[in-house]
């Protein structure tokens, strides 16, 4: 049985473990599609995507169409004659004309247990909503938003200390085996498809910076989830006077408080205790504008005074 001719489409780091596995597999990785280089950083220099950097390092052809609205981009893909297209966080909509090019269709590695958390930010939403488990789903793509029939699922627990960053890394690594299993099943014509139950679908819309502000009138558990879900981006924040204070790490406590939500109850080497709508939140790692991430303990040792007991965080 011959290996499959694979075209890969993806942009961020999430797809790199699967790319590493693909190039070592018996399948033939013919080309990589990724988003165009974008300006980034203070100098606004054009930056290549992690997937493009990987492809160049491995001497794989790279294609970067703006979209697939023009026939030229569609024809270019068609000329590669792929058996299958593997799509992981590509970031471009694939029209029906593109989905129909590969002989075995396009398959997507999605970072949730579908049909829960269809959409752009499944990892963040799993943490925000306190899900006990997350995982990856390999599905056949159709024109809907993460609505296609499922080929394989793999689950993992979401721990109370998981951030979007740590869960992202776990799911990226655990995507490899289910993807390779699905490719083998497709190659041997033994793939099993399971339709999604649309009644169970939930949607994870795109996260934006405006959502990152902490509402101290929420519970300590809800605020803790938000801080973890928004780490490493966009990072949850509050206002300490007129200063934006980013909070990188905190945990809910069982200390009850009757003070106004947002009031700093205490600061010591264990952290900064802040009142919420129920129990206090212990803030452990912070970042002031233009400064590095620092533990509250180290901040106290620095002798600075912007934070103090009785301060109202907004």
Curated annotation (Swiss-Prot):
E.C. number(s) listed in UniProt: 2.1.2.9
Positions of disulphide bridges: none
Signal peptide interval: none
Annotated PROSITE patterns: GART (PS00373)
Family label: Belongs to the Fmt family.
General function of this protein: Attaches a formyl group to the free amino group of methionyl-tRNA(fMet). The formyl group appears to play a dual role in the initiator identity of N-formylmethionyl-tRNA by promoting its recognition by IF2 and preventing the misappropriation of this tRNA by the elongation apparatus.
Name assigned to this protein: Methionyl-tRNA formyltransferase
UniProt organism field: Legionella pneumophila (strain Lens)
Origin organism lineage: Bacteria, Pseudomonadati, Pseudomonadota, Gammaproteobacteria, Legionellales
Gene that encodes the chain: fmt
């Amino acid at each position: 049985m011959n290996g499959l001719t694979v075209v890969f489409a993806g942009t961020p780091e999430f797809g790199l473990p699967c790319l590493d596995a693909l190039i070592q597999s018996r399948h033939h990785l013919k080309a990589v599609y990724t988003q165009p280089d974008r300006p980034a950083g203070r100098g606004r220099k054009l930056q290549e995507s992690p997937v493009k950097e990987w492809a160049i390092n491995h001497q794989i052809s790279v294609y970067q169409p703006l979209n697939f609205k023009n026939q030229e981009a569609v024809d270019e893909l068609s000329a590669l004659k792929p058996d299958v297209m593997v799509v992981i966080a590509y970031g471009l909509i694939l029209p029906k004309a593109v989905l129909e090019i590969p002989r075995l269709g396009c398959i997507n590695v999605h970072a949730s247990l579908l049909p829960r958390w269809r959409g752009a930010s499944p990892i963040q939403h799993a943490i925000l909503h306190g899900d006990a488990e997350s995982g990856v789903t390999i599905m056949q793509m159709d024109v809907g938003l993460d609505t296609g029939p499922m080929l394989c699922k793999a689950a993992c627990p979401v721990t109370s200390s998981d951030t979007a960053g740590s869960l992202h890394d776990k799911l990226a690594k655990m995507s490899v085996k289910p993807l390779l299993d699905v490719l083998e099943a497709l190659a041997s014509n033994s793939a099993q498809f399971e339709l999604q139950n649309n009644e169970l679908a939930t949607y994870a819309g795109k996260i934006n910076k405006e959502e990152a502000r902490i509402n101290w009138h929420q519970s300590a558990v809800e605020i803790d989830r938000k801080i973890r879900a928004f780490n490493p981006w966009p990072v949850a924040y509050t206002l300490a006077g007129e200063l934006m204070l980013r909070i990188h790490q905190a945990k809910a406590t069982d200390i009850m408080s009757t003070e106004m939500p947002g009031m700093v109850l205490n600061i010591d080497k264990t952290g900064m205790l802040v009142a919420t709508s129920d129990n206090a939140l212990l803030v452990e790692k912070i970042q002031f504008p233009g400064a590095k991430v620092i533990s509250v303990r180290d901040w106290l040792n620095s002798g600075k005074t912007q934070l103090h007991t009785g301060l109202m965080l907004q």
